[in-house]
A protein has these predicted regions:
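Short amphipathic alpha-helix that is part of the acyltransferase structural core
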Residues: 4-46
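A short, polar/charged loop/turn motif at coil->beta-strand junctions and beta-hairpin connectors
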Residues: 16, 28, 60, 80-82, ...
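Acyl-donor binding region in acyl/amide transferases
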Residues: 21-24, 49, 67-187
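Conserved beta-hairpin
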Residues: 34, 48-68
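Short, P/G- and charge-enriched loop/turn segments at secondary-structure junctions
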Residues: 40-41, 184-191
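Short hydrophobic/aromatic beta-strand or adjacent loop that forms the aromatic wall/cage
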Residues: 196-201
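Short beta-strand-to-coil "C-cap" segments at the C-terminal boundary of structured domains/repeats
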Residues: 202-206
């Protein structure tokens, strides 16, 4: 219901993807949009480096977040330094967009990253648990690198969280939400879900 209330904009039928604008943005602008349109419903815990918005006539119709890899030291598999590697952390658009909207959006950000940063490779994951196999990545010349090992998520309310969310600390003290999740697991209000491996995709910027 939230997304219908906040984002009831419909792309005019005569619009083509090349009519859309991709703009550098920030998390404050896209937070509510992502929490409404991305399957994770969350940006909690993301380390964020670059944020982009996709616009049609100044209406936000898509959002994308890039940041360091979520798994500690995972960058070593792809680059010589952590700054070589950037992960596409979130991508979502409103439902009613023309064909190829997401691939157009990704392509624009790929070119921006190549021109404006020193990153050498983009890594992204297609979440098989949510039925994603990476069609959009294959359409934008990403290379399929295999699967991650199976994992597990914490289901709490209508959202899921990585199991590392219960271990996040600030100055050696559990963050409030981490403690809240732990309490929910103990009370039975939250539970673990076993998940299949995610599809790994990479795109070389240089």
């Amino acid at each position: 219901m939230l997304k219908e209330l906040l984002y009831d904009y419909k792309v005019p039928l005569d619009k083509k993807v090349t009519d859309f604008d991709v703009k550098v943005s920030n998390i404050q602008v896209v937070r509510d949009f992502i929490q409404s349109w991305h399957y994770s419903k969350s940006v909690n815990g993301l380390r964020i480096s670059h944020v982009f918005g996709l616009y049609c006539d100044d209406n936000l119709i898509g959002a994308m977040i890039y940041g360091p890899l979520g798994m500690a030291n995972a960058w070593r598999k792809y680059g010589e330094s952590e700054s070589d590697v950037i992960e596409l952390r979130r991508l979502c658009c409103i439902d009613e967009t023309p064909k190829c909207t997401e691939s157009y959006f990704i392509g624009k950000t790929q070119r921006w990253l190549k021109k404006n940063t020193d990153h050498k490779i983009i890594v992204s994951y297609a979440d098989a648990y949510h039925g994603h196999t990476g069609v959009i990545y294959r359409a934008t010349n990403f290379k399929h690198e295999g699967l991650t090992t199976p994992g597990r998520l914490i289901k709490y309310g209508d959202k899921t969280y990585h199991d590392k969310a219960i271990r996040t600390k600030y100055k050696n003290v559990l963050k409030p939400f981490a403690q809240k999740l732990r309490d929910a697991l103990e009370s039975g209000d939250a539970h673990y879900i076993n998940t299949p491996g995610k599809h790994i995709y990479t795109f070389r910027l240089r």
